[in-house]
C-alpha cells in the first residue's frame, strides 16, 4: 500500500510538494497531523532525505508527543534522529550547547511564572517602586510583549522616549534581565529570544543548524509571534524548504503575542511559496461546519476557504436563550444528565466551553448538586503546589547554584533557624560583591554582621555540596528521595498528622513517580533534563481523554481538542464578544479575533452542538442584560433547531422578571428530584422562542429543605457531626455560622482538607 493511498487529493499534493516554501491552509479537523507525518515519511522513503535533516515544530508537548508517535510508527528505523519538538524545547536544546557564547552557563534554570513574579517583586522592592500604582503584573506583561517582538532593554528604553510609564518599564526591564543573568536563568520568552540572538551573533552556529535542518515543518503557524517567525526564517534561510501548516481562521492568541500576519503574509515573505488548502473536514457534521463557515465569513482579514464533510448533515444546532445565568447552568446540567441516562453519550463526551473562567462557578455548583462528575482545566498546576515547588527548588539549587530564587526558597525549609535579617545580610553582601546568593552562603563567615548565624548556614552549604556530588552518580528519582530523607521533609508532614499533609505527601510521591517515568523514556536522563522537562509542561498536556468526566474549559484552552457533544455557553454581546472589545478603538480587529474564537468553539463539536445564552447575568457584582451574541445571529436560521426571538419588554417588566430571577438564583437551588431530567430540550426552562410553550424552571426554596439547611430553618447536623459531601466525601463539621439567609459551614474533610461553604449549596448529609 502506497503512502499516498490513505490521503485525499489536496493532502497528497501537500505531501508531495517537498521543495521550496509551502503554506498548507488546514481547516479545522482536516487531517493536518496526518499530512505532516505522511510528508515526513515521504521525504525519507521516496525522496531519500536523511531523517537527521528533518525538523518538525509544534506548540504543545501533547501535539509533539502524538506526532512523534505517528512518525515512529510510519518511519521506523532512523526516526529518532528527527527533531519533533515544541518551539521552547527546540530552543532549550540549542541553548544547552551554545548559550555560553552569550555569557550564560549551559546549566541555566528556566523560570516559570511564579519564579518571575518572585523576581519581579524583589526588583520592585529594590527600585522602591510603588506596586499599588505600578503592578508587578504590568511590568511582566510589558517585558513579555517586548520579547515577543525581539525588543531588548536598550531598544525598549529608546522607544520609551518621553513616556513616563514606558521609561519606568524600561528601567525594570533592564534590572529584570540583569537579575536573570546573575541567577543564570531564562524565562520562557528568553528561550526563543536568546536563540535568535545567538543565531544573529554567531553565524557559524546558525550555519550548522541550517545545514542540519534542511527540511523544516511548523504546525499551528497562525499562532507564531514575531520572535518565533524570525527563528524559523533564520533556520530556513539557506535551503528554503519550509513547510508551514496553519489556519488563519483559528488565530486566537493575540493576547499572547501571536501575529496573524505571519500566515496572512506568508507569500510576501516567501514569494516562491506554494499554497494548498485542506477543506475536507473529518470531525464534524455538515450543519456544524455550515454554521462555522457562516460565522467566519464575516471576517475581512482572512484567506478564503470553506469546510465540507462526507459525514452527513447531522442534527441542527440547538440554541437556548435562558432568563438567567443560573437557569443556563441548570439547563446544561439537566441536558447532560438526560443524554447520559439515555445512553447517547458518556460524561467524557461532553464539554462546556466558555469565554471567561468566572463562568465555570455556576456550572460547578449545578454539577455538584446533580452528581455529575467534572473537571476544570486551568486550575492549579501540579508543579505550582508548595511541596512540589519546594523539592524542585532543592533540585534546581543542586543543578544550578546561581539560581538565587531557588536557594532563597529552601534556605529555611525545613527550618534551620536562619532569620530574615541574616538572609538579608547575605543578599546584600552578594549584591555588593556581584556574586550569587549561594556563593555568598559558601563564604558566610565573611559576611559583615552575620556572627553566629554563619554557623547555622554552614550545614546547609555542606548538604548542597554533598548533593551536587551525588547528582553525578544517582538517578533523579534517587537523588530526590535522598533530599527528602536527609531534610526530613516528609517526616515533618507525617508529624502533622492532617489530611492536608497526607495529600501533600501524595503529591511528593507523584513527583517521584514523574522522575522515574522521565528516566524510563529518556535515553540519557540528567537532573538538568528533568528540570527542563518539568518547566515545559503545560496544564492542557495533562488532559486525559479516557477519564469519564465532563470537561469545563475556556475556548482558548479547547483549541486542538474535539468532543462529540459540545456546549458553548454565555453567547451574549458584552460577554462574547466582550464589551471591552466591542468598544475598543481597534474594534474591528478585536471583534475578528473574537469571531475566530467562536469559530474554534463551533468546530470542536463532532456530532452535537448546543449554544446557550442568558438574558441577564451577574458580572463583577453588577446585573448585566445580554443581547444574543452577534456570532449566533450570524448563523443561518435554517441551521438552528428554533428561531431566535428577542422580545423587547418594558424596563419595569425586566426589573420584575429577569432581575428578580437573577436575585432569586442566589437564594435558591434547583430541585433535581424528579422534575427536569429526561425532558426534551426546551421543556421546563425559560426559553424565549416563538414556538416555546415551556413553563418556568421549578425551584424549591432552601428553607424548605432540611438537608440543605438555611438560616431560616434548621440543619440536620451540628458541630462535631460527621457529614458527607457529594464531591469532597466525608468529613467533620468544625463550625457553623449564621449568615442571615444561609449558614456558613466549615468542614474538615478526610481527603479534601478544610472547606468553608454555604449550607444551601453544600447539600451536606449527616452520616
Annotate each PLM feature.
Residues 571-753, 761-766:
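C-terminal accessory regions
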Residues 4-19, 227:
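N-terminal pre-P-loop "Q-motif" helix
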Residues 3-6, 42, 218, 226-322, ...:
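Conserved RecA-like helicase ATPase core segment
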Amino acid at each position: 500500500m502506497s503512502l499516498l493511498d490513505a490521503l485525499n487529493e489536496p493532502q497528497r499534493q501537500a505531501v508531495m510538494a517537498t521543495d521550496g516554501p509551502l503554506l498548507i491552509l488546514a481547516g479545522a479537523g482536516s487531517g493536518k497531523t496526518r499530512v505532516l507525518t505522511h510528508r515526513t515519511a515521504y521525504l525519507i522513503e521516496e525522496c531519500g532525505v536523511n531523517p537527521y535533516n528533518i525538523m518538525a515544530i509544534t506548540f504543545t508537548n501533547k501535539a509533539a508527543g502524538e506526532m512523534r508517535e505517528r512518525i515512529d510508527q510510519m518511519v521506523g528505523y532512523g526516526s529518532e534522529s528527527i527533531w519533533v519538538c515544541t518551539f521552547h524545547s527546540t530552543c532549550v536544546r540549542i541553548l544547552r550547547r551554545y548559550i555560553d557564547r552569550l555569557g550564560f552557563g549551559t546549566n541555566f534554570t528556566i523560570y516559570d511564572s511564579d519564579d518571575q513574579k518572585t523576581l519581579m517583586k524583589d526588583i520592585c522592592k529594590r527600585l522602591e517602586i510603588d506596586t499599588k500604582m505600578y503592578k508587578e503584573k504590568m511590568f511582566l506583561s510589558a517585558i513579555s510583549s517586548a520579547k515577543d517582538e525581539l525588543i531588548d532593554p536598550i531598544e525598549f528604553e529608546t522607544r520609551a522616549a518621553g513616556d513616563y510609564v514606558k521609561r519606568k518599564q524600561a528601567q525594570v526591564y533592564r534590572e529584570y534581565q540583569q537579575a536573570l543573568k546573575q541567577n543564570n536563568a531564562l524565562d520562557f520568552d528568553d528561550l526563543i529570544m536568546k536563540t535568535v540572538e545567538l543565531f544573529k551573533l554567531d553565524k557559524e552556529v546558525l550555519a550548522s543548524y541550517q545545514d542540519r535542518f534542511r527540511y523544516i515543518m511548523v504546525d499551528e503557524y497562525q499562532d507564531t509571534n514575531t520572535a518565533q517567525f524570525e527563528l524559523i526564517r533564520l533556520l530556513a534561510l539557506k535551503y528554503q524548504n519550509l513547510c508551514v501548516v496553519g489556519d488563519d481562521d483559528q488565530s486566537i492568541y493575540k493576547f499572547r503575542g501571536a501575529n496573524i500576519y505571519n500566515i496572512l503574509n506568508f507569500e510576501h515573505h516567501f514569494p516562491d511559496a506554494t499554497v494548498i488548502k485542506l477543506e475536507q473536514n473529518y470531525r464534524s457534521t455538515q450543519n456544524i461546519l455550515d454554521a462555522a463557515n457562516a460565522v467566519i465569513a464575516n471576517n475581512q482579514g482572512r484567506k478564503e476557504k470553506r469546510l465540507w464533510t462526507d459525514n452527513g448533515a447531522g442534527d441542527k444546532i440547538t440554541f437556548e436563550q435562558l432568563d438567567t445565568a443560573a437557569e443556563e447552568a441548570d439547563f446544561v446540567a439537566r441536558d447532560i444528565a438526560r443524554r447520559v441516562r439515555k445512553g447517547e453519550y458518556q460524561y467524557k463526551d461532553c464539554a462546556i466551553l466558555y469565554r471567561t473562567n468566572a463562568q465555570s462557578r455556576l456550572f460547578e455548583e449545578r454539577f455538584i448538586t446533580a452528581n455529575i462528575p467534572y473537571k476544570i482545566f486551568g486550575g492549579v498546576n501540579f508543579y505550582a503546589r508548595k511541596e512540589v515547588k519546594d523539592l524542585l527548588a532543592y533540585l534546581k539549587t543542586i543543578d544550578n547554584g546561581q539560581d538565587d530564587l531557588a536557594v532563597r526558597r529552601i534556605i529555611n525549609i525545613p527550618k534551620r533557624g536562619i532569620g530574615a535579617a541574616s538572609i538579608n545580610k547575605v543578599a546584600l553582601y552578594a549584591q555588593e560583591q556581584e556574586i550569587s546568593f549561594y556563593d555568598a552562603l559558601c563564604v558566610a563567615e565573611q559576611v559583615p554582621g552575620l556572627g553566629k548565624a554563619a554557623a547555622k548556614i554552614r550545614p546547609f552549604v555542606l548538604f548542597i555540596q554533598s548533593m551536587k556530588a551525588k547528582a553525578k552518580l544517582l538517578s533523579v528519582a534517587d537523588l530526590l528521595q535522598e533530599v527528602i530523607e536527609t531534610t526530613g521533609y516528609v517526616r515533618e508532614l507525617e508529624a502533622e498528622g492532617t489530611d492536608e499533609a497526607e495529600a501533600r505527601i501524595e503529591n511528593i510521591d507523584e513527583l517521584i513517580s514523574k522522575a522515574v517515568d522521565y528516566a524510563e523514556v529518556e535515553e540519557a536522563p540528567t537532573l538538568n533534563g528533568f528540570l527542563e522537562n518539568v518547566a515545559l509542561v503545560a496544564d492542557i498536556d495533562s488532559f486525559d481523554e479516557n477519564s469519564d468526566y465532563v470537561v469545563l474549559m475556556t475556548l482558548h484552552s479547547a483549541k486542538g481538542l474535539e468532543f462529540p457533544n459540545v456546549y458553548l455557553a454565555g453567547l451574549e454581546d458584552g460577554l462574547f464578544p466582550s464589551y471591552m472589545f466591542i468598544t475598543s478603538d481597534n474594534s474591528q480587529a478585536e471583534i475578528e479575533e473574537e469571531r475566530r474564537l467562536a469559530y474554534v468553539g463551533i468546530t470542536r463539536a463532532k456530532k452535537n452542538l448546543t449554544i446557550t445564552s442568558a438574558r441577564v447575568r451577574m458580572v463583577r457584582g453588577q446585573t448585566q442584560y445580554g443581547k444574543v451574541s452577534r456570532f449566533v445571529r450570524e448563523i443561518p436560521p435554517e441551521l438552528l433547531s428554533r428561531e431566535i426571538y428577542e422580545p423587547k419588554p418594558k424596563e419595569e417588566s425586566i426589573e420584575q422578571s429577569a432581575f428578580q430571577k437573577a436575585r432569586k438564583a442566589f437564594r435558591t437551588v434547583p430541585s433535581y428530584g424528579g422534575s427536569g431530567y429526561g425532558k426534551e430540550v426546551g421543556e421546563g426552562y425559560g426559553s424565549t422562542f416563538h414556538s416555546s410553550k415551556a413553563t418556568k424552571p421549578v425551584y424549591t426554596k432552601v428553607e424548605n429543605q432540611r438537608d440543605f439547611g438555611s438560616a431560616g430553618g434548621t440543619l440536620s447536623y451540628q458541630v462535631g457531626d460527621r457529614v458527607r459531601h457529594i464531591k469532597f466525601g466525608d468529613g467533620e463539621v468544625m463550625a457553623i455560622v449564621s449568615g442571615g439567609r444561609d449558614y456558613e459551614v466549615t468542614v474538615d474533610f478526610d481527603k479534601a482538607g478544610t472547606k468553608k461553604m454555604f449550607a444551601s449549596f453544600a447539600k451536606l448529609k449527616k452520616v
